[in-house]
From Swiss-Prot:
Signal peptide: 1-21
InterPro entries xref list: Conotoxin_a-typ
Keyword Secreted: yes
Protein name: Conotoxin Bu19
Molecular function terms from GO: acetylcholine receptor inhibitor activity; ion channel regulator activity; toxin activity
Entry text on domains: The cysteine framework is I (CC-C-C). Alpha4/7 pattern.
Family named by the database record: Belongs to the conotoxin A superfamily.
Positions where Cysteine amide occurs in the chain: C64
Keywords per UniProt: Amidation, Disulfide bond, Ion channel impairing toxin, Neurotoxin, Secreted, Signal, Toxin
Amino acid sequence: MGMRMVFTVFLLVVLATTVVSFTSDRASDGRNAAANDKASDLAALAVRGCCHDIFCKHNNPDICG
């Protein structure tokens, strides 16, 4: 393989790595945002004393157990 061919393969590998990294990062951002929203909702319910209210406790078993 010539030097030009090696350089071309190197550039293709860098480009492919960048594309894969970019798309997986965007997917990860969506999951992180959803997790953060759920965590803030759970924290808000806990702060308001949801687990002491029978109806709230019944509607949110994931927090109150």
